[in-house]
Amino acid sequence: SPDRTKVAVENQQPGTRSWMLDRTAIDPASRYRCPWVEGYASRTRVMAGESISFFVSTQPASHFQIDIYRMGYYQGHGGRHMGSWGPLQGKAQPTPNPGSKRLQDCHWAPCLKLIIPSDWLSGVYLAKLTEHHSSMQSYVIFIVKDQRQADFMFQCSDHTWQAYNRWPNQFSLYDNGQSQWYWGGGVEVGFNRPYGKYCQILDAPLSTGSGEFLLWEFPLAYWMESHGYDLTYVSNQDTHQYPEE
């Protein structure tokens, strides 16, 4: 059926390497965040026709731009540019006080609400944030899913990304405020916050904000899409909430 060739057809679209970050940095005081520009999305995954909002903080306040890319093979470039939004007015948004069980739950003002176009194929999408004053950059990551049957289901490990996310400073599922690595209960994490630096060994990793997708999962997606495998993408949240689908 025509659906079987969706990934192969998608990867015939012009590719680009502009999805890569050119300049980023980690605040030495926190060791985990890029306060010049950082953000998160209202949803971890979304379907075509549904809306997703982006929440961005720029410190100091300045304008910024959002460029969204679908990640795949694309003639070896790794991504396809889906659109640009901006310049948008940014502002410094507050770091929340720790909630119950050390939960970091940001309640930032949204900067952009986007309706996912009908022709955006299921996949992993990176929203590249570029702050105009310092040219600092970071990512917001989200998944576009669909309900079609495919030969392969690519499940992103976003629950794991979030479990190890220490944004803004030592607030992962394995931090209790006292031990370097904590293995007990009484700690919660959530998706209403940016992804901080985790296990990248560089001081300014060019994957800031993408969870652990670029580190561990993108190579498989790149390879599978290069061979035109029929696949669809989901989040850990999908298999947790809707295993029957």
Where are the language model's segments positioned?
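Proline/serine/threonine-rich low-complexity linkers at boundaries of modular beta-sandwich domains
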Residues: S1-W36
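Residue-identity detector for threonine
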Residues: T5, T16, T24, T44, ...
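Ligand-binding face of N-terminal immunoglobulin V-set domains in extracellular IgSF glycoproteins
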Residues: T16, P35-H63, D67-Y74, G79-F142
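Generic detector of short, locally flexible boundary/turn motifs and exposed helical patches
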Residues: S18-M20, A29-R33, Q89-Q93, P219-W223
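Aromatic-Pro/Gly-enriched surface loop or interdomain linker
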Residues: A61, D67-M71, Q75-G86, S134-E245
